[in-house]
Amino acid sequence: MFFILIIFIFTTLTAVQAQVEEPPPLIEDKNEIVRIETRLVDVPIVVTDKGGKPLLNLKPANFLVYEDGKKQEVAEFSTTTEPFEVALLLDTSGSTRGDLRLIQRAAAGFISSLRSGDRVSIVAFKTAVRDGKSVAVSDVLTTLTDDRTKLNNTLTEVKTSNGTPYYDGLLSIVDKVFGGKPDDKFRGRRAIVALTDGVDSTSDSDFEEVREELEASGVAVYFVQVDTREYFEEELLGDCQTSLRFSTAQIRRYYRIFYPKSNEKVSDFCKLGDFERLDISKSLYQLANSEMQNLAKKSGGKVFPVSSLNEARSAFSEVAAELGTKYSLGYYSTNQKLDGSYRKIRVELKGVPPGAQLRARDGYTAPEN
């Protein structure tokens, strides 16, 4: 199962990021001390006309923002001309190992399509030895930089991996590339772009953990979803010593999600029959598709399906084109409660041509004491 994650730190994302603007002041009221927190929320937005073409040169006055139905004041704004940050995560495992050069060329094409001033970080999956065992891990090959020569040289260093730590890779990106939890600054246009089939094979973390961390980061997520199922299933059948197989973690996840009450749970791949292998494959691919759609929608990103890596470069061009037309605005929420509740975001347009449409993140979870 292969996976290329392009982390595209894109300010204009259609995502909403809850950020702590400054350390909350303490206000003393007689015998009670009340903590007030001022939070900056980032909202990446894509705006198109009725024909689907991007609407450029919009101003803060063209946007109305509501949180849980209450109007908010736009305090920060990034236009489509301001630079963004991109982290490129490449996973060359499983069915894509033989296409390493194709992956490298597609990634190089994506980098070349970015504008001057846009910064990129390259993160890759690789095979490492831990406690005497060969495992797949993620590795930050370059920090954020606009040095195109350095980035292209780094692409030549990308190697193959014996697994897909998909969730671990996303968490690593949030922490090591984006700097972990939101800080007190308006971060602008950021995004994650992932070229992957989305099927995790070796992560220690799970989807819910990733979803929560991405939501807190406010980074939009884009997927170039490569269909590897047919190839993978062909390699699954027959001799259990085949080059492709389910990891123990995948098999356990399959039973936990789809058959939680089953008493017969086989974790040894070699003890699975062909019918069971195909059922696991079908279920995990469907789950991966659902998770990608969820992450993209919640963050204001998008999924771009492709049937093979040969189509990846054109899909990257589409992603880059959309990222280049994103806006990002920020507001200080009038709801200062630290209750961990989910806050719904609604953005409306005014003073734009009839039929204009927008896509933005639909909400965020507030901090909790």
Residue positions per predicted region:
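Scaffold/interface architecture of coatomer-like assemblies
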Residues: Q17-N369
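Bacterial N-terminal signal peptides
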Residues: F2-T14
